[in-house]
Amino acid sequence: MMARSATRRLERPCDERAGAGRPATTRHWVPIVVGVVAWLAVWQIVAMAVGQEIVVASPLRVAQVLGHLVASGSFWVTAARTAGHIVAGFLLAVALGTALAWVASLHRWVAALLSPPIRLTRLVPVVSFIILLLIWGGSAWLATTVSCLMVLPAVFDSISEGLARVPSELREMARVFRVPRWRTLTAITAPALWPYLIAACRVGVGLAWKAGVSAEVIGLPAGTIGERLSMAKLYLATGDLFAWTAVIVALGIATERLALWLLGRAERRFEGVGL
């Protein structure tokens, strides 16, 4: 059936598919562009009204600083180092949170054992973790560890909820017919978990970047975005502060888009798996 539907899709004229998709894409992007331009205009008006770059740097000044940063060789090394640490922490949290939620769904005593530390991690301020980790191990992997700790509870809670909502009759059917565990995972469990995993990733990416950069600002590991933000604060370079903030936002959006794209590809691969 999937092969026939794929064949029917291929038989449609290319110009028909392109024409059908173009208006939807335009409708999607036009409000976003208008909103961005409107807020940039508000920002420019506020900067002109204040009249002090040290308080509010204008968008033009930030764009100029950003251009100088991008042209320098150290910018890419700095951005890559911070992104690598934060993405590593995010991926570790997704893997660890998913595994712990899976084990907790199978054994009640594991769920009871994990509940206090998960809840504690969710409630303790991120700055407390940062200071403790600095005392215990320095700043080399601080951003990775803090990002992982902040994202882990969100992933654990979301995956736990998804596992609890997997249809029990399907799992019982798989058990009765002695379906292999890997087949049960790919055909029953994984499809039910995709919405929860996607939701966890949407929330987790933002948490990872906020926590990771905060850790760098406090820990000051050399050659990181957090160190550059701290230097901008020290020298009251508001333009640099805004420019590096724009870089963080852009990297966060890129990370989220990449994660969702990879999840989408994985979901499509599981769509054709049956019992």
Q: Where do the model's predicted regions map?
A:
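Transmembrane alpha-helical segments of polytopic membrane transport and secretion proteins
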Residues: 1-37, 257-275
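Periplasmic/extracellular loop-to-transmembrane helix junction in inner-membrane transport proteins
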Residues: 21-22, 48-91
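Transmembrane-helix boundary motif in ABC transporter permease subunits
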Residues: 88-118
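C-terminal transmembrane helix and the adjacent membrane-cytosol boundary/short C-terminal tail
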Residues: 108, 164, 195, 199, ...
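Generic hydrophobic transmembrane alpha-helix motif, especially the helices
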Residues: 119-154, 161-162
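Glycine-rich helix-loop "coupling/hinge" segments at transmembrane-helix boundaries
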Residues: 135, 210-248, 270-275
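Transmembrane alpha-helices
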Residues: 145-149, 181-215, 243, 255, ...
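Short cytoplasmic-facing helical segments at TM-TM junctions of multi-pass membrane proteins
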Residues: 158-200, 229
